[in-house]
Amino acid sequence: MDLKKYIYDIPDFPSPGIIFRDITPLLQNPETFRRTVELLAEKVVDLRPTHVVAIESRGFMFGAPLAYKLGLGFVPVRKEGKLPRESISVSYDLEYGNNTLEIHTDALKPGDRVVIVDDVLATGGTMKATVELCERLGAKVEALLFVIELLALEGRKKLTGKKVISLVQY
């Protein structure tokens, strides 16, 4: 199945010169959405993960059904101030400013084997921060999963030493 048929290019969104890759058509089509989750599962099942970690918010769209498909626990990584219990955080730089991500301190433990899911690999900063959170809790990061990878932004360079898997590349 050619997933690119279900990812629309939206020029000049959210600002001039940007081509936004819209995944909503992929999500709206039940067969395509199901196949996307199946493809992600096929890529990591042999790694024998214990948890699926996903990044707010679009990573949740793929991470939760992937965890369900694999029969694993789901761990959300959220933006600052969104988790109700004790958490750890990491801040990272964006092109214009910075962001902070958090994970509950009891979400993972030493010996856990995780795959981390997000919708798009762009610069790699968000994923690198998420890897740091998981490793600080003692988990082993087995793979980093993306539906889309924007090759020109070279996000893989920030993720050296990790298994990076993307379904569609632009």
UniProtKB/Swiss-Prot annotation:
Pathway: Purine metabolism; AMP biosynthesis via salvage pathway; AMP from adenine: step 1/1. It is found in: Cytoplasm. GO terms for molecular function: adenine binding; adenine phosphoribosyltransferase activity; AMP binding. It is an enzyme of class 2 (transferase). It catalyses: AMP + diphosphate = 5-phospho-alpha-D-ribose 1-diphosphate + adenine. It holds the Pfam family Pribosyltran. One of its GO terms (biological process) is purine ribonucleoside salvage. InterPro entries: Ade_phspho_trans (IPR005764), PRibTrfase_dom (IPR000836), PRTase-like (IPR029057), UPRTase/APRTase (IPR050054). Its EC number is 2.4.2.7. One of its GO terms (cellular component) is cytoplasm. Gene3D superfamilies: 3.40.50.2020. Keywords: Cytoplasm, Glycosyltransferase, Purine salvage, Transferase. Its main location: cytoplasm. Homodimer. Catalyzes a salvage reaction resulting in the formation of AMP, that is energically less costly than de novo synthesis. Belongs to the purine/pyrimidine phosphoribosyltransferase family. This is Adenine phosphoribosyltransferase. It comes from Carboxydothermus hydrogenoformans (strain ATCC BAA-161 / DSM 6008 / Z-2901). The gene is apt.
